[in-house]
Amino acid sequence: MPITRMRMRPWLEMQINSNQIPGLIWINKEEMIFQIPWKHAAKHGWDINKDACLFRSWAIHTGRYKAGEKEPDPKTWKANFRCAMNSLPDIEEVKDQSRNKGSSAVRVYRMLPPLTRNQRKERKSKSSRDTKSKTKRKLCGDVSPDTFSDGLSSSTLPDDHSSYTTQGYLGQDLDMERDITPALSPCVVSSSLSEWHMQMDIIPDSTTDLYNLQVSPMPSTSEAATDEDEEGKIAEDLMKLFEQSEWQPTHIDGKGYLLNEPGTQLSSVYGDFSCKEEPEIDSPRGDIGIGIQHVFTEMKNMDSIMWMDSLLGNSVRLPPSIQAIPCAP
């Protein structure tokens, strides 16, 4: 036969009214507000007979502790008492008045009016629903994707898969598709395709496709040979000038040379190399200026002959009969 014991709320009221536990007192008896000493066991000056007296009395009342049979465990006594207080529906903590730190730590609670039978049933049903939802969430969280895939792979399929398809409706489906699909002749399809191709406009990819490709004509052989003929003609003219030329003696800086007068006229072919004569200046040194000008003119003519020789190179060679003969001074 189970032993009946007093519930926690009336037992707690009896302990407060007895004034046997230090620190357990009413703060406001009309509002049913009271305080419980809640000093931590690690604090200096903590005493098991003074600070853990209420928790030990509750452990003895519930039968979890018997003096002389078990070793004292104030930490477990306090944890069990706190869980019992939080489970009471008609007692709540006044957190703004509680002090959880220091040597004078206390917790303040308020006793609510007793619940009726209907309120107790509603509260009990609500708590049971919450418990069921928590268990469902826990079960869903425990099931991992690996276990789910293993369960799918473990399911075996029958060897005969003919039962998955309904072959009796295959012919009916084909007949329905034939009735719905209109019959199109191949001539109509080909004509529509041809019209569609005719309406298409081909757009060039770039601007180069807008103009026709034009190829320039190849040069004729007569035009290509004109340059060679002109070069040959120039060489012949030069040879004629050398053959018709006459050599004349001249003196420069006391040295005698033969000067080819007609050869100095080659400037008409390659350009005018003659200097413009300056007007005569009436001065006592006029004769000296004229002599210097004549010397520079002769030197220029000699330079033009040497330039022509380097230009012609191997293409035009002087005949062996024409040679520069130095004159004795």
Curated annotation (Swiss-Prot):
Look up the record and give one Gene Ontology term from the biological process aspect. positive regulation of transcription by RNA polymerase II
Can you cite an annotated GO cellular component? nucleus
Which GO molecular function annotations are given, in alphabetical order?
A: DNA binding; DNA-binding transcription activator activity, RNA polymerase II-specific; DNA-binding transcription factor activity; DNA-binding transcription factor activity, RNA polymerase II-specific; RNA polymerase II cis-regulatory region sequence-specific DNA binding; sequence-specific DNA binding; transcription cis-regulatory region binding
**What does its activity-regulation comment describe?**
Activated by MYD88.
Q: Which residues bind DNA?
A: 5-113
What keywords appear on the UniProt entry? Acetylation, Activator, Antiviral defense, Cytoplasm, DNA-binding, Immunity, Innate immunity, Isopeptide bond, Nucleus, Phosphoprotein, Repressor, Transcription, Transcription regulation, Ubl conjugation
Residues with PTM N6-acetyllysine:
78
| Region named Disordered | 93-166
Induction of its expression: Induced by IFN-gamma. Induced by influenza A virus.
PTM: Phosphorylated by CK2 and this positively regulates its activity. Ubiquitinated in a SPOP-depedent manner. Sumoylation represses the transcriptional activity and displays enhanced resistance to protein degradation. Sumoylated by UBE2I/UBC9 and SUMO1. Inactivates the tumor suppressor activity. Elevated levels in tumor cells. Major site is Lys-276. Sumoylation is enhanced by PIAS3. Desumoylated by SENP1 in tumor cells and appears to compete with ubiquitination on C-terminal sites.
**Residues in cross-link Glycyl lysine isopeptide (Lys-Gly) (interchain with G-Cter in SUMO):** 276, 300
Q: Where is the composition biased (Polar residues)?
A: 146-166
UniProt-annotated location(s): Nucleus; Cytoplasm
Which family would the database say this protein is a member of? Answer: Belongs to the IRF family.
Protein name according to UniProt:
Interferon regulatory factor 1
Q: Which organism encodes this protein?
A: Mus musculus
Q: What gene name is listed for this protein?
A: Irf1
